Structures are given as structure tokens and as C-alpha cells.
């Protein structure tokens, strides 16, 4: 009993080796090279905000931590076997451990807000926490809708899908911009926010990701060919294909519905779906055109005059 009382009266002890054990699923993924798109974007955004290198490094660490943790959860929710060319973390470490680690890393990232706030005389911790909570809620709202539609086989409209994406994918982009805006020195000035741009960027990024999932060989190597079909996901081109087939091709509609319900891993069947979206419904061409239109809209209306480097980043999203 003395030893128990000693534990109760002393500080809570957590060792470095225990921390390493807990982070194993996270480290499994974070050590695999990703696209680094968000890191590049933060550096480009900082051309408008003028944060210190120390602040930029902290924002980058926080956003990367949230992104990787969300991927751990995503892969469980989507039953994905692969991520970044290796077995998904839950395949290696199990779902319970991976879920716990991902949730833990959300809180670790939140603890970084205190370090960021301390780097400004005003110490805007309350503002940073508000941004963090709002955008994490938005992210989970979007993800929840995406899962609900998939699991109840509720085909969303294109408009509803884009609204969902603005929550799910736009959340981390908005969080990045809003945190950087809270940290910048001096008055904001009229029209100085990049939040509308980050909203559109989230949509552009997700629609492009949906397109590449069905067409890009590099994505096939990292996640498996047309992984969205195996997940039964209502991605942007698949929604368009279903809407087309429902009106113009009942047999094609039945085929698409059947394959999505099967959650098939059969490559031949998935290639038939992709061919249908390419040659019959025109969904891939439609999606590609929408990507180009979104990029043009962002560049012409939402990027400040001095944003040449940001324009280059947007252009990189339209090169297939």
C-alpha cells in the first residue's frame, strides 16, 4: 500500500520508451515520404503573413501531425490496406492501438498551440484554441457525412458533396490559414484573409485526388488501383457517373451500384468501372474540366496580386 500511496502523491510518470511505444502506428506512417503539399503551402502562405521561421516550423509541425493522425483514422474507417506504398498502420498494429495513437496525436498537436501563443507578446492562446476546435469539428463533420453516405448507400448531389469536402478536406487548409492569421503582427486590413481561398483549395485538392485515384499509376502503387471503388466511396467522378447512368443508362447504373456495394478488390471489375466513367458517362473528362475551372477561379479571383508563387502551386494541381 505504501507504494500505491507513493504513486498517488508523486508526479504522473511517463517515460520516453513508453512514448515511443505509443507512437509506433504514427511513426510507421510519418516516416514514409508523403506529398509534402501542405508544408509547401505553409511556406508560400507565409509570404503574405510574415511569420518567423520558428513560428512557421511550429505551424508546419502541428498541421503535419494532424494530417498524419487523420490518415490513421481514415484508413481504418475506409478499410484501406495500404498507405504511401506500405501496409496501413492498423494492418500492422491493429485498429485499437492505431485509433488510440491517432487520438493521442490530436491532443499532442493541440498542446503545440501553447508554444505558438508564447511566441507573441499578446499570447493569443484562446484564439488559437477556438480555431483548432472549430476546424477539427468541421473535419469530423465532413468525414462523418462521407461515411454515412457510403454506408447507407445515399448518393449525394454534386453540391452536397462539395459542401462536405469543404468541411472534410478544407478543414486543415482553413486551420492553417486561420492560425497563421492569428499569429501575424499588425492590423489585418480589409480583404486580407485567405480563408475563402483555403475553402476553394480544399475542394480543388479533393476533386483532384478523386480523379487521380482512378487514373494515376503512382497513386495505384501507393494505395492500390482505384482504391475508392474498393471502399465503395462516392467520389466526385463516381457521383457524376451514377447521376448520368440513372437518367441515361439503367443497366449501367445497376452495374455501378453492384460494384460499389461489393467493395471489390478485383482489378478487372474496377477497370470496367473506370472505362465506363471514361468512355460512357464522360465523368473523368467532366471531373478534369472542373479541376481546371476551380484552379482558374482561384487564380483569377482569390490570389492577391503578389501571389505568383501561390499561382505556381495551384498550377501544379492541374498537371496530370
UniProtKB/Swiss-Prot annotation:
PROSITE patterns: POLYPRENYL_SYNTHASE_1, POLYPRENYL_SYNTHASE_2. One of its GO terms (cellular component) is cytoplasm. Mg(2+) 1 binds at residues 74, 78. Isopentenyl diphosphate binds at residues 35, 38, 67, 84. The keyword ATP-binding does not apply. Binds 2 Mg(2+) ions per subunit. Its main location: cytoplasm. Pathway: Isoprenoid biosynthesis; farnesyl diphosphate biosynthesis; farnesyl diphosphate from geranyl diphosphate and isopentenyl diphosphate: step 1/1; Isoprenoid biosynthesis; geranyl diphosphate biosynthesis; geranyl diphosphate from dimethylallyl diphosphate and isopentenyl diphosphate: step 1/1; Isoprenoid biosynthesis; geranylgeranyl diphosphate biosynthesis; geranylgeranyl diphosphate from farnesyl diphosphate and isopentenyl diphosphate: step 1/1. Its cofactor is Mg(2+). It is found in: Cytoplasm. Dimethylallyl diphosphate binds at residues 83, 168-169, 206, 223, 233. It catalyses: isopentenyl diphosphate + dimethylallyl diphosphate = (2E)-geranyl diphosphate + diphosphate; isopentenyl diphosphate + (2E)-geranyl diphosphate = (2E,6E)-farnesyl diphosphate + diphosphate; isopentenyl diphosphate + (2E,6E)-farnesyl diphosphate = (2E,6E,10E)-geranylgeranyl diphosphate + diphosphate. Catalyzes the trans-addition of the 3 molecules of IPP onto DMAPP to form geranylgeranyl pyrophosphate. May be involved in vesicle trafficking and protein sorting. Belongs to the FPP/GGPP synthase family. This is Geranylgeranyl pyrophosphate synthase. It comes from Eremothecium gossypii (strain ATCC 10895 / CBS 109.51 / FGSC 9923 / NRRL Y-1056) (Yeast). The gene is BTS1.
